[in-house]
């Protein structure tokens, strides 16, 4: 049984608005240490805003973001930088640098953020590329030479090379064909299992839920309105959950 001691991330009464548009409206959520948690919901409900608030990329209006028992939403300077080292994020678009080789993209944080020598950083980058199913030769290519799915793999390698405690994924299968999406979903699960870390994924894709999730939360009207295990989601009598699942099935 999970206890409070197992909680890695606590979100308490989060509020975020843009003008009169309310995005997060008293959101509460616990994410346990080393679990794979997936937030689902249709496009436009605020999933990406939630991620950015968790990282401090957007300020919250009020509420608390607690990681490892410490309040983080008001951290500044060195304390904030230390907190951010716990996280790595794979953005929806991959956000690779076109002017750099693939290995340079993967090693960017090591070289620029930690001062790791380029020779060692390249070796570590190639190791991480191999971990996500790519070979050393790919490391010498540029992002525009790779498919969308391969770019997603590179983004995964760039995230895990930083050895985060918490790995965040923003709509990991967006824009991908079903075969490639399945490969990326399997890769996310592999990263979670092999690295034994906490993963937090936001998606509108039920195939991601089925492959990746230990537990699932449904975001609607600015709150997590339902949460449970993968087995429980199919049995849920929550109207919004069933409506979302039905729409996904229909679209597939």
How would you describe each model-predicted region?
Residues 55:
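Helix-to-loop junction immediately C-terminal to a conserved catalytic motif
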Residues 71, 119-137:
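Conserved ABC ATPase "signature" region
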Residues 142-146, 150:
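Conserved ABC ATPase signature
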Residues 163:
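Conserved catalytic motifs of ABC-family nucleotide-binding domains
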Residues 167-170:
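Catalytic Walker B motif of ABC-type/P-loop ATPase nucleotide-binding domains
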Residues 178-180:
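Helix N-cap at the start of a conserved alpha-helix in ABC-type nucleotide-binding domains
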């Amino acid at each position: 049984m999970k206890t409070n001691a197992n909680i890695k991330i606590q979100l308490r009464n989060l509020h975020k608005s843009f003008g009169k548009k309310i995005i997060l409206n008293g959101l509460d959520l616990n994410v346990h240490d080393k679990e794979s948690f997936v937030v689902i919901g249709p496009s436009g409900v605020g999933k990406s805003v939630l991620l950015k608030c968790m990282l401090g990329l957007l300020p919250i209006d009020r509420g608390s973001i607690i990681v490892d028992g410490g309040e983080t939403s008001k951290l500044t300077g060195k304390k904030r930088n230390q907190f951010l080292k716990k996280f790595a994020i794979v953005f929806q678009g991959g956000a690779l640098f076109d002017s750099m080789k693939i290995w340079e993209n993967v090693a960017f944080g090591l070289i620029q953020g930690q001062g790791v020598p380029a020779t060692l950083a390249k070796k570590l980058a190639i190791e991480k590329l191999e971990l996500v199913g790519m070979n050393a030769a790919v490391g010498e290519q540029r992002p525009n030479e790779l498919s969308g799915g391969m770019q997603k793999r590179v983004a995964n390698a760039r995230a895990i090379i930083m050895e985060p405690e918490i790995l965040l994924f923003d709509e990991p299968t967006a824009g991908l064909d079903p075969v490639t999406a399945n490969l990326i979903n399997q890769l996310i699960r592999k990263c979670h299992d092999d690295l034994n870390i906490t993963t937090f994924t936001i998606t509108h894709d039920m195939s991601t839920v089925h492959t990746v999730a230990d537990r699932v939360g449904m975001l609607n009207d600015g709150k997590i309105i339902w949460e449970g295990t993968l087995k429980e989601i199919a049995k849920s009598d929550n109207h919004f959950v069933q409506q979302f699942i039905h729409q996904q099935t229909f679209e597939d």
